[in-house]
């Protein structure tokens, strides 16, 4: 089981290195790695498990963050509950907006329009706040292989697009704060979407 102790922090060279494609068909080792990464995200989002294991909540994880130069990422984005007229929360019909283990993921096309998360981004490998808009593509098309070894192509927008770009960046040795304009961190570029 992956814990916070397994996640390397900024300054560790692997975070700045480009990961290698995993070999297809996938090895049992790589399939298990992806499953463990996804389980970590599940645990980090479960209040009881997160407290018990001392986990910070996360929606994505890349193998680089475990010190492994493999193009393996896991993404787990929960759906938010809806609120009825009386202000009561209604559980979402689907628990997750996105739940995927992606091998050799790459962005094959993207929008010209930019987007950024309203409050900026964070990272399990960064133990400090880095304020500012992390400017990314508003929409992306991503190709990857799933754990069954099937080639997939998906179109993403809004928060899922941002999350997957963050994780793919890790496999290319790029950190989220590389996308922040350090001279004007909260600059809103023309036409940029702010994702809440």
From Swiss-Prot:
Specify the superkingdom.
Bacteria
Cofactor(s) this protein cannot do without? Fe(2+)
Enzyme Commission (EC) number: 3.5.1.88
Single GO MF descriptor: peptide deformylase activity
* One annotated GO biological process: co-translational protein modification
> Which UniProt key words apply to this protein?
Hydrolase, Iron, Metal-binding, Protein biosynthesis
Offer one Pfam family short name for this entry.
Pep_deformylase
**UniProt catalytic activity:** N-terminal N-formyl-L-methionyl-[peptide] + H2O = N-terminal L-methionyl-[peptide] + formate
EC top class, in one word?
hydrolase
| Active-site annotation | 167
What SUPFAM superfamilies does the database record attribute to this sequence?
Answer: Peptide deformylase (SSF56420)
Q: What's noted on cofactor binding? A: Binds 1 Fe(2+) ion.
Where on this chain does Fe cation bind?
123, 166, 170
HAMAP family found in the cross-reference section:
Pep_deformylase (MF_00163)
Q: What does this protein do?
A: Removes the formyl group from the N-terminal Met of newly synthesized proteins. Requires at least a dipeptide for an efficient rate of reaction. N-terminal L-methionine is a prerequisite for activity but the enzyme has broad specificity at other positions.
The entry's family comment says: Belongs to the polypeptide deformylase family.
Protein name per Swiss-Prot or TrEMBL: Peptide deformylase
